[in-house]
Regions:
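Glycine-rich loops and low-complexity Gly/Arg-rich segments
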Residues: 71-73, 105-110, 168-172
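Ordered hydrophobic segments in well-structured contexts
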Residues: 2-5, 12-22, 122-128, 137-144, ...
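Solvent-exposed residues in well-ordered beta-strands and their adjoining turns
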Residues: 83-87, 130, 171-175
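Beta-strand secondary-structure signal
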Residues: 79-83, 124-126, 167-171
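Short helix-loop boundary/capping segments
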Residues: 90-145
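Intrinsically disordered, low-complexity regions of eukaryotic proteins
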Residues: 57-61, 71, 124, 182, ...
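Mixed-charge, glycine-accented linear interaction segment located at domain edges/termini
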Residues: 140-195
Length: 195
């Protein structure tokens, strides 16, 4: 059949497995410190980046809707969501967004009614990419969410003879210090042969 085909480079451009969430990543070297992995997840990770547009020709007579010359991009909404299977006090604080870990009792996490600048933090999702994904030179897709804040709250779903599940959602935020900087970046790097 003439159109039952796939691109010849398909197997070099596949993203594989669930990936990981980390607090830090170095794209230049493709290295992750294991102590920066935020937690074990289940069911994979979902990232969405949705633009918000204004149609400046919307109220102009004789102007068709969605005239490309009059389309204005207002902002981006970038979210990442999934389910953690592991949790500790640092992760609970992060999921609550506005919260503090106790100074004298480090087992206690107390929510606040105000958001502090320190509640925002960068989050990276990194997944294996390409047909060459060895331990040293493996390819990756990485998404850097800047100024991320938990907007899904703290949730736990327990079950009989099951692991507890902690659903999460983080939203990237613009900053007044760099209002023109879109708060996410995407890196795609093909792997190379291992030495």
């Amino acid at each position: 059949m003439k159109f039952t085909q796939i691109p010849t480079n398909t197997f070099k451009e596949l993203q594989l497995n669930a990936g990981i969430l980390t607090s830090n990543f170095t794209p230049a070297t493709g290295t992750v410190e294991s102590n920066n992995i935020l937690g074990a997840t289940s069911g994979g990770i979902n990232f969405t980046a949705t633009p918000s547009y204004t149609d400046l020709g919307d109220d102009i007579d004789n102007c068709p809707k969605n005239m490309m010359e009059l389309k204005k991009l207002d902002s981006w909404e970038a979210k990442i969501s999934g389910t953690f299977l592991t949790v500790n006090t640092a992760q609970a604080k992060s999921l609550l967004a506005a919260a503090d870990v106790g100074g004298s009792d480090t087992t206690k996490v107390t929510p606040r009614n105000d958001v502090a600048p320190t509640d925002f933090d960068d989050i990276w999702w990194i997944g294996d990419y390409s047909d060459k994904n060895g331990a040293t030179n493996g390819g990756y897709i990485a998404i850097h969410m800047m100024n991320a804040l938990s907007t899904g709250g703290f949730q736990i779903q327990s079950g009989d003879k099951a692991k507890g599940q902690f659903a999460f959602e983080y939203t990237a935020h613009y900053s007044m210090d760099a209002a023109d900087t879109v708060p996410f970046e995407i890196y795609i790097k093909a792997g190379t042969e291992e030495a």
